[in-house]
Each structure stands twice: as structure tokens, then as C-alpha cells.
């Protein structure tokens, strides 16, 4: 058996984290890592105390969830950021994994942060965002988080 690279290792953990999601369409997992240590994890799920997605009629409608701006889920990245302190996140890496609930296969867009999550990631001081395609965002010398790869939709 081949030993996974460090990025593969953390992406595998992000996949395992995603399996906690109750979403009926897609599972997302996020792992925040700093200096080789996991500081936080998150998966897409409704806010604490609210009904799980199993009761969501939007998912049962057969429509593409991207059209549902009112989806109650808190994104994986948001949950990971909420669970970590700002000092821990400064300079940390964020690993993202996304999977289809039906097939268990990685989703085509390879787990990219939405615009709101990207704003939170920038403000949290996260240094890099990594998905299956590799490093997709990285903070430049001027401190700005910039895309390194084009998003696939």
C-alpha cells in the first residue's frame, strides 16, 4: 500500500468528516490544519438544534441545490471556522472534500468554497485552501488570498 502524501492524508480525513453530514445531496468536509496539527473540523449540516436535512423538502424536490439560496445548512468551512480560535487559524491550511451522497464519488466541482465561505476564510487569516486538485487558493506576499486554479462548474 502506498503511503498517502500529507495533502492526501488530510483530504481523507476531510472525507471522513463529511460523512457526518445529513444532507441528502452532497457531503462536504473541512479540516483546518496548522503546523501539522488538526485544529478544527466541520461538515455541512443545519445549525445546532434545528431539524436535520432528512426532513428538508427542498432536497426531495429533485432540483439542483445550487438554486436554493435558503438552504438551512451551515457549510463545512463555516463550521470549521466557528469551532477554531482566530489565533489558531492565522496561517492555517483548509482542506476541503465534497462527495455525492448517491454515488460516494467526489463531486465534479471538487469542493470549492462559495463566495460567503471565501470571505470568512479570508477574514480568518487562513493561508491556503486545498482540495483534490491541489492548492486552489494561497495567500500572497501582500497578504491577499488569491486563486491558483480555475473553478470547475
Regions found by a protein language model. Name each.
Residues 2-5, 12, 39-153:
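Zn2+-dependent cytidine deaminase-like catalytic core
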Residues 27-41:
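Short beta-strand scaffold segments in enzyme catalytic cores
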Residues 1-27:
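Short, basic/aromatic recognition patches
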